[in-house]
Amino acid sequence: MRVLIIDDDTTFCQLLAETLQGKGIEVEWTTDGFGGYEMSLDQPYDLFILDQRMPLVLGSELAEYLREDNPKAKIILTSAFADEALGDIARSIDSPLLSKPFGADRLLELIKRLLSRSRKHSKLAKP
């Protein structure tokens, strides 16, 4: 599995990458939203973890760009400022919202759910 983390907090990216790599997940990260979008065009990722509040682009906006190129992209939105309005935004882009700080177990369980949901949909779509 390949994951791209896009968050303007370098320390958060490094810690999250180390956690996921410790579980055998291939991880790349960037602190630049548009740079992350460019990375997604160059190589495929199974999952994107996006911070909502970044300097040049909101994570929810970035999710829309990513889904234009890959409608089945699996995306987790994160924020230290999660509220009901952001929850509504996350639902509107069909992405779960994780409120920072969150534990590794919670993230790993969410990743498992997203991947199993995607496998179920692909099995249903086959004739």
Q: Language-model features: where?
A:
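Charged docking surfaces used in two-component/phosphorelay signaling
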Residues: Q14-G22
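Short hydrophobic/Thr-rich beta-strand motif most characteristic of the beta2 strand and flanking loop
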Residues: G24-T31, M39
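Receiver (REC) domain active-site loop signature in two-component systems and cognate sites
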Residues: M54
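Active-site residues of response regulator receiver
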Residues: D51
